C-alpha cells in the first residue's frame, strides 16, 4: 500500500484484515471525468473487487447520489476544487501578462527573440508543473477525507524538493500495466501523446496550453507546495527546462479577464538575469570571480608600447613587468595593442614575418628583421638585429656608445612598425595611433616621430606618451653624441642640458620630455618628487615647464602570477596555496615550509622578516645592516634575497655567519624563492631612499604580508600608515632614511604582531582585499591616451 500512496493514485483501498491479497485477484477500471457545472467536479469509479474481506471504497458524485461517505468529505472536495480553479485562473492571468511583457520587449529590442521563446517554454513548463501539483492535491485531499489519518495523514505535496513532475514514455506505461495489475495511474500527464482532458469551464486544458502531440521529455522542474505556487515565474538562478512543443492557440476563457494580483517586476528581472545565468554556467572553474573590465567604446585606439625589456621574455626590473602586463589590460578594454621589444634570444612563440628593413646608425647600414607572436590578445613584435643578440643576461651591457647605437636603431625601427609589420595580416597604420615609450632607452621615439614625420605632415594623428620609471638614468653623454642620433641640427638644443657639476651635456631624456605629447610617472608621489631639485636629477626645470602634460599613475600587478591562491611556486616542498578564507591555515604552513627550506628553526610564534630587492644604496640595504643587531635582540628571524654591490653582498654573508640560527642571506636572485619569501614572511622591509613605484610592497599585501616602508614615491601612495584607534591603514611607514626611524616603525609592527592579533588580522584582510590589478591602471592610461589624441 506504500507504493499506492507514494504514486498518489486516486483509488485507495482500506484493508480490513491482515491477510495478504494477491494482486492477480484485483480488477480495476478507468476513472472518467465528466463536465460539471462551474465550481464542482465529478469523479466516477468502479469499486475494487477484493473478496469478502475487502470493503469497497467509492468516489463521491456531485449529483447527489446516495453514498455512505460523510457530507463533510464531500464539502472538503468541493472546496478543494474551487481553490484549484482559482489557482488556475491566477496562473493563466500571469501567463497572459508574461506574454504581453515579452511581446513588448521584442518590439522595443528585436535581439530578444530568443528570450521570448525561452519565456514561453518556461511558462508552459510552469503550467504543466502547477497542473500536476493541483490535481495531485485533489487526489490526496480526497484520500484524506476517506481514509484513516493515521495511514495517510500527510500529503505528498508537503515534500517540497523531493516531489518532481515527469512524463514517462509509452513503453514505461505498458511495463507498469503488466507488472502491477492492482492499480492503474489516472494522472493526466502519464501519456506523452495525449494531453489532459481536465475540464475548465467547458474547455479542456489542451485548448489553452500545449500542442496536440507533446514529445517525451526528461524530468527537470521541481514541484513545490500549493502555498508557494502563487508566482509562476521560475527563479532566475535555477531555470527549468520546458517542452519544446508548447504554444498558445485558443483565446482565454471569459472568466480570466480579471487583472492579475502579482506584479510583473519579477518577470522583468527574470528577462534581465537570463543572460547572466547562461554566462555564469559557462565560466571555467577558478575564473568565475574574474570579471572583464568595461570596454573603451568610442575611445578605442591602436596602442604600441615600446620598451627595452618585457616579461617574461626579458626582465631586469619593474619596467619588464609593466611592459608585460599593462598591454594585456589595455587589450581587455578593447584596444588593439602591440608591444615592441628587442629580440635578445630565440623565443619559441615568435615567428619570422619575413619583413626586412635597413637603417643607418653612426654612418653604418644595419638590417633588422621582425618576429611576431600573438599572446593574450596582444601582438608582441620582436626586432632582431646582430646588435641585440646574445644580450639576454645583460641587456644594458656594453660601453656608453654601444648602448646608444642600439637604442637609436631600436627607436628608428619601432617608429615604423605600424607601416611595415602586418600583425594578423593587417598593419596598424598611423591613424588613431598612440606610442607609449618607456624610460630613456626609448625616449628618442617621440623625437623621431616629430622630426621625421609630423614636421613633414606625416603621421599627423599619431601621438606619443613617455613614461618615467626611474629618472636617475637619463642617457647622458658629451654634446658630441648628438651626431649618433641622426637628427637635423636645430634639434641639438632639445638635447642640451646644463649640469652645475658637469656643465653642458647631451641628455636623451630631456629631449624626450620636450617632444612627448604626454608624460607619465609610475606613481603620484613620484610625479611630485621629480619636480623638486632633489628628486628631478637635473631635469626638474624641464618637468616644471611642461607640468601641464604630467600625471602620475600607480602601477598594478599581475594578479594571476602574484596570487597566493594560484601561485605555482607554492605547490611543492610543503608549501600550500591559500586565500583570505583560509589565511590562518595556509600562511603559517608556508612560513614553516620556508623556515625548513632555509634551515631556520621552525617556530610559528617568531616574526619572520623578509627583504627582496637589489643590493644597492637606493634600496636602503645599509639601513637594514645598521638595524640588524637590534632586530636579533628582539627574537625575530630575517631573510634577505638580492644581488648588487659587492660590499653589500658581503654584508649579507657576514650577517648569516654571525646569526646562524636567526638570519639567512641569499646572494643572487630566484623567482621561486621570491614568491616563497613573500608567502612565508610575516613582514616585508622596503627602506628605499627613493622608489618611483615599487612592486614588492604590492605583492606582499596581496599575500597577507605586512610592509614596513620608507614613505617616498610609490611607497607613500600604496602603503597607508596603520592607525590603531580607527583600525585603518595597511602597514607602517617612516619619514626619513635613518636606521633609528626604521627601528621605531619596525618596533611598533612587532608589538602589534605579538600583542594585538585582531589588529594584525585586520591589516592582512585590508591588504588582501585591495584591487591591485592592472585593470584600474589601464583605465587611467586610457584617459591619458585620449587626452593626447585630442591635443593639437
Curated annotation (Swiss-Prot):
Residues 105-295 are annotated as: Disordered. InterPro entries: GS/SS (IPR011835), Starch_synth_cat_dom (IPR013534). Residues 179-192 have a biased composition (Low complexity). The lineage of its organism: Eukaryota, Viridiplantae, Streptophyta, Embryophyta, Tracheophyta. It comes from the Eukaryota. It comes from Arabidopsis thaliana. SUPFAM superfamilies: UDP-Glycosyltransferase/glycogen phosphorylase (SSF53756). ADP-alpha-D-glucose binds at residue 315. HAMAP family: Glycogen_synth. Residues 1-55 form a transit peptide. Signal peptide: none annotated. Its EC number is 2.4.1.21. Pathway: Glycan biosynthesis; starch biosynthesis. This is Starch synthase 2, chloroplastic/amyloplastic.
Amino acid at each position: 500500500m506504500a507504493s499506492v500512496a507514494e504514486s498518489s493514485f486516486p483509488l485507495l483501498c482500506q484493508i480490513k484484515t491482515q491477510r495478504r491479497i494477491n494482486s492477480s485477484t484485483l480488477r480495476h477500471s478507468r476513472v472518467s471525468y465528466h463536465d460539471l457545472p462551474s465550481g464542482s467536479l465529478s469523479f466516477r469509479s468502479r469499486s475494487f473487487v477484493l473478496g469478502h474481506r475487502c470493503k469497497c471504497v467509492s468516489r463521491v458524485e456531485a449529483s447527489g447520489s446516495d453514498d455512505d461517505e460523510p457530507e463533510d468529505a464531500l464539502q472538503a472536495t468541493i472546496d478543494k476544487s474551487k481553490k484549484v480553479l482559482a489557482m488556475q485562473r491566477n496562473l493563466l492571468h500571469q501567463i497572459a501578462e508574461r506574454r504581453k511583457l515579452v511581446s513588448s520587449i521584442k518590439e522595443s529590442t528585436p535581439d530578444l527573440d530568443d528570450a521570448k521563446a525561452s519565456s514561453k517554454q518556461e511558462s508552459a513548463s510552469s503550467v504543466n508543473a502547477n497542473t500536476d501539483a493541483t490535481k495531485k492535491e485533489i487526489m490526496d485531499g480526497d484520500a484524506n477525507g476517506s481514509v484513516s489519518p493515521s495511514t495517510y495523514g500527510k500529503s505528498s505535496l508537503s515534500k517540497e524538493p523531493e516531489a518532481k513532475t515527469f512524463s514517462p514514455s509509452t513503453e514505461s506505461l505498458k511495463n507498469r500495466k503488466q507488472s502491477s495489475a492492482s492499480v492503474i495511474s489516472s494522472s493526466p500527464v502519464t501519456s506523452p501523446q495525449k494531453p489532459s482532458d481536465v475540464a475548465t469551464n467547458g474547455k479542456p486544458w489542451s485548448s489553452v496550453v500545449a500542442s496536440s502531440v507533446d514529445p517525451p521529455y526528461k524530468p527537470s522542474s521541481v514541484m513545490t507546495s500549493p502555498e508557494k505556487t502563487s508566482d509562476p515565474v521560475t527563479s532566475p538562478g535555477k531555470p527549468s527546462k520546458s517542452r519544446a512543443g508548447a504554444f498558445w492557440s485558443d483565446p482565454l476563457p471569459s472568466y480570466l479577464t480579471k487583472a492579475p494580483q502579482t506584479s510583473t517586476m519579477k518577470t522583468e528581472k527574470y528577462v534581465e538575469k537570463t543572460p547572466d545565468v547562461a554566462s555564469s554556467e559557462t565560466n571555467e572553474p577558478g575564473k568565475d570571480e574574474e570579471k572583464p573590465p568595461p570596454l573603451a567604446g568610442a575611445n578605442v585606439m591602436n596602442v604600441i608600447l615600446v620598451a627595452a625589456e618585457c616579461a617574461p621574455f626579458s626582465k631586469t626590473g619593474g619596467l619588464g613587468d609593466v611592459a608585460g602586463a599593462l598591454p594585456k589590460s589595455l587589450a581587455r578594454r578593447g584596444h588593439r595593442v602591440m608591444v615592441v621589444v628587442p629580440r635578445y634570444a630565440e623565443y619559441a612563440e615568435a615567428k619570422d614575418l619575413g619583413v626586412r628593413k635597413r637603417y643607418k646608425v653612426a654612418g653604418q647600414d644595419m638590417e633588422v628583421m621582425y618576429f611576431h607572436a600573438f599572446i593574450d590578445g596582444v601582438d608582441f613584435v620582436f626586432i632582431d638585429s646582430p646588435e641585440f643578440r646574445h644580450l639576454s643576461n645583460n641587456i644594458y651591457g656594453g660601453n656608453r656608445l654601444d648602448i646608444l647605437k642600439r637604442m637609436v636603431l631600436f627607436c628608428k625601427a619601432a617608429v615604423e612598425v605600424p607601416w611595415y609589420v602586418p600583425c594578423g595580416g593587417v598593419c596598424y597604420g598611423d591613424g588613431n595611433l598612440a606610442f607609449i615609450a618607456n624610460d630613456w632607452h626609448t625616449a628618442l621615439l617621440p623625437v623621431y616621430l616629430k622630426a621625421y614625420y609630423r614636421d613633414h605632415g606625416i603621421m599627423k594623428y599619431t601621438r606619443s606618451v613617455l613614461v618615467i620609471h626611474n629618472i636617475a638614468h637619463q642617457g647622458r653623454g658629451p654634446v658630441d653624441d648628438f651626431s649618433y642620433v641622426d637628427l637635423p641640427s636645430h634639434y641639438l638644443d632639445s638635447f642640451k642640458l646644463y649640469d652645475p657639476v658637469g656643465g653642458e651635456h647631451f641628455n636623451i631624456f630631456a629631449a624626450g620630455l620636450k617632444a612627448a605629447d604626454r608624460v607619465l610617472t609610475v606613481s603620484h608621489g613620484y610625479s611630485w618628487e621629480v619636480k623638486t631639485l632633489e628628486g628631478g636629477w637635473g631635469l626638474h626645470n624641464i618637468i616644471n615647464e611642461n607640468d601641464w602634460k604630467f600625471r602620475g599613475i600607480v602601477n598594478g600587478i599581475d594578479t594571476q602570477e602574484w596570487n597566493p591562491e594560484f601561485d605555482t611556486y607554492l605547490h611543492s616542498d610543503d608549501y600550500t596555496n591559500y586565500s583570505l578564507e583560509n589565511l590562518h591555515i595556509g600562511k603559517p604552513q608556508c612560513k614553516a615550509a620556508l623556515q625548513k627550506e632555509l634551515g631556520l628553526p621552525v617556530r610559528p610564534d617568531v616574526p619572520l622578516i623578509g627583504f627582496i630587492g637589489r643590493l644597492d644604496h637606493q634600496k636602503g640595504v645599509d639601513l637594514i645592516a645598521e638595524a640588524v643587531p637590534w632586530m636579533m635582540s628582539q627574537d625575530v628571524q630575517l631573510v634577505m634575497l638580492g644581488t648588487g654591490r659587492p660590499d653589500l653582498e658581503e654584508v649579507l654573508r657576514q650577517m648569516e655567519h654571525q646569526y646562524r640560527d636567526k638570519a639567512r642571506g641569499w646572494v643572487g636572485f630566484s623567482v621561486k624563492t621570491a614568491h616563497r619569501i613573500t608567502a612565508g614572511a610575516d613582514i616585508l622591509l622596503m627602506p628605499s631612499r627613493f622608489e618611483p613605484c615599487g612592486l614588492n610592497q604590492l605583492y606582499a599585501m596581496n599575500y597577507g604580508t605586512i610592509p614596513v616602508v620608507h614613505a617616498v614615491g610609490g611607497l607613500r601612495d600604496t602603503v597607508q600608515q596603520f592607525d590603531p584607534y580607527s583600525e585603518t591603514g595597511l602597514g607602517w611607514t617612516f619619514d626619513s632614511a635613518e636606521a633609528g626611524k626604521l627601528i621605531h616603525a619596525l618596533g611598533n609592527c612587532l608589538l602589534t604582531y605579538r600583542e594585538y592579533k585582531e589588529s594584525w588580522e585586520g591589516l592582512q584582510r585590508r591588504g588582501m582585499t585591495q584591487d591591485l590589478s592592472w585593470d584600474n591602471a589601464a583605465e587611467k592610461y586610457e584617459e591619458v591616451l585620449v587626452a593626447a589624441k585630442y591635443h593639437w
